[in-house]
Amino acid sequence: MNLPDLNVTCTCVRVPILRSHSISISLQCEKELNLDEVKESLRKQKGVIYYDDLVNKKYPMPILSSNQNNVYVGRLRKDKVLKGGVALFCSGDQIRKGAASNAVSIIKCL
């Protein structure tokens, strides 16, 4: 293609998996976010494990999140396509932390 100004954000995911769902998320925000502040906020969230160390090849994978209630989040980076965008990757056990258990968690908060 030879398009030096073409902005692309991508995530590689390998399958098959035994359990747990994963999702690549791109968020568009009204303003640019400081990634260090986003990381710190994610680390403080109950039920979230911020797991992101690309040097040591540690990032969210289905095998890590299987059989637990925590959701692993990582691969946080600026989205090069969306203005004010952030991209991240999440993995969580769909049986332990799926729609039904999330509904129960929300009801408890209310």
Q: Residue ranges of each PLM-predicted region?
A:
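C-terminal substrate-binding/catalytic lobe of Rossmann-fold NAD(P)-dependent oxidoreductases
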Residues: 1-87
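NAD(P)-dependent Rossmann-like dehydrogenase/reductase catalytic/cofactor-binding core
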Residues: 70-73, 77-110
